[in-house]
């Protein structure tokens, strides 16, 4: 978590979820407190949380670690090529070493060498991964290059499912994980933002083929980060972590579909959301086997 959290001007050009605001030490402190409380809340529900401090001033988006690395069953870690130079500075060897010390890690595949060629794939922001059916859902953008996506899918045995998605103003969706999330028994997705009707139907059909219920999200709900959620394993059940902003945007029927399989845990992070990301962005999931 960052002590110098602020809106990243390098990423503002293609992330319309970011809000222009005058940032101060007070807002940075508030964001720090939000992440601290969010971690405590998840731990109280039985989720294992590894929280890292970031006292530097040159990585304003370090609160969003899911973009630079991901972990995978079988002991695999991927490190990703990032578009903004400031975001490349988020990569930390101590995080990878912690994972090696606490979990069984077989190999680390580093794609960051693609950056000088202008090829980017920003982790589980660029891709929403179905770890059960092995599908990588990806909305095309400057941060999701098809070459890098193909390499990842080949290395990690995922089927790529690529589509174009735009908001109501015609602006491309910068990260797939603001548009959709895939849980064990359901998927929430802003289908109306997928521009091609045929491809939209194919995406929905692929999700349904896996046996999942579909929670269709409106554009307004996507704007409220309702798609930026993540399923986690709690002490007694699966939980769906999302923000209080996202929860307030959901309808009763949508909540009922989610709660039929997972307990909803809402985290209050309004300051962090001003920087263009919500709960899913703040969490890098661990799919590795613990050593003990």
Regions from the PLM with identified roles:
Residues 1-292:
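The feature marks the mature, well-folded catalytic cores of soluble enzymes
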């Amino acid at each position: 978590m960052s002590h110098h959290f602020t809106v990243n001007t390098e990423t503002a050009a293609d992330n319309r979820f970011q809000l222009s605001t005058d940032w101060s030490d007070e807002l940075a402190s508030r964001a720090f407190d939000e992440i601290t409380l969010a971690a405590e809340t998840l731990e109280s529900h039985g989720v294992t949380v590894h929280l890292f401090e970031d006292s530097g001033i040159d990585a304003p988006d370090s609160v969003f670690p899911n973009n630079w690395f991901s972990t995978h069953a079988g002991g695999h870690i991927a490190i990703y090529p990032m578009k903004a130079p400031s975001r490349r500075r988020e990569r930390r060897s101590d995080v990878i070493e912690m994972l090696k010390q606490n979990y069984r890690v077989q190999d680390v595949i580093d794609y960051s060498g693609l950056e000088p060629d202008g090829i980017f794939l920003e982790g589980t922001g660029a891709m929403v991964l179905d770890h059960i059916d092995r599908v990588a859902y990806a909305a095309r953008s400057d941060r999701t290059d098809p070459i890098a996506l193909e390499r990842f899918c080949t290395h990690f045995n995922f089927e790529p499912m690529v589509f174009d998605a735009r908001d109501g103003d015609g602006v491309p969706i910068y990260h797939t994980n603001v548009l959709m999330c895939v849980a064990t028994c359901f998927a929430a997705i802003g289908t109306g933002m997928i521009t091609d009707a045929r491809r939209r139907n194919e995406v929905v059909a692929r999700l349904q083929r896996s046996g999942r219920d579909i929670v269709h999200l409106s554009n307004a709900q996507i704007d409220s980060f309702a798609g930026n959620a993540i399923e986690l394993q709690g002490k007694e059940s699966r939980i769906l972590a999302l923000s209080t902003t996202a929860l307030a945007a959901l309808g009763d029927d949508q909540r009922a579909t989610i709660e039929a399989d997972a307990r909803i845990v809402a985290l209050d992070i309004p300051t962090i959301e001003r920087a263009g990301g919500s709960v899913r962005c703040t969490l890098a999931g661990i799919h590795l086997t613990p050593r003990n």
